[in-house]
């Protein structure tokens, strides 16, 4: 009987450890996906405001392609989503000489819509 209890306890520990590891890995992928979406949104909004902006030579996106665990398909889906949706978060400055890119990208980054899209994309 003690043998069965010991085996059952070991199974519970293994399953718990496995679930925890999977959650950590998923969380890292989720954060990478959100980071890439933020990069893509900043680049998209800067191109909208000024096509000669220095941000257009920012190679941060390459980090996500080369060093993250995101697949190329996931990156492409995120980029397409950002290009289609991020301008919905565009805010207009009260000062006509300025813009609100940082605030607009922050709103997009923190949106439930982006979170939901990324969750759906990573689960496919």
Regions found by a protein language model. Name each.
Residues 29-33, 49, 95-99:
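Soluble non-cytosolic domains of exported or imported proteins
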Residues 27-43:
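Post-signal peptide N-terminal segment of mature Sec-exported envelope proteins
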Residues 54-124:
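Compact alpha-helical subdomains of small soluble proteins
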Residues 15-18:
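C-terminal motif of bacterial Sec signal peptides marking the signal peptidase cleavage site
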Residues 20-22:
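Bacterial signal peptide processing site
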Residues 39-63:
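Post-signal-peptide N-terminal segment of Sec-exported extracytoplasmic proteins
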Residues 12:
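Active-site phosphate/ATP/adenylate-binding loop shared across adenylate-forming ligases
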Residues 2-9:
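Sec-dependent signal peptide recognition
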């Amino acid at each position: 009987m003690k043998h069965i209890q010991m085996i059952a306890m070991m199974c519970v520990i293994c399953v718990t450890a496995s679930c925890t590891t999977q959650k950590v890995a998923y969380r890292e992928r989720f954060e990478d996906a959100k980071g890439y979406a933020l990069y893509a949104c900043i680049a998209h909004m800067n191109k909208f405001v000024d096509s000669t902006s220095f941000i257009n030579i920012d190679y941060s996106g390459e980090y996500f392609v080369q060093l993250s665990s995101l697949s190329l398909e996931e990156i492409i889906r995120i980029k397409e989503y950002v290009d289609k949706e991020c301008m919905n978060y565009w805010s207009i400055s009260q000062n006509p000489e300025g813009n609100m890119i940082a605030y607009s990208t922050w709103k997009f980054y923190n949106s439930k819509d982006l979170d939901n899209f990324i969750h759906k994309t990573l689960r496919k």
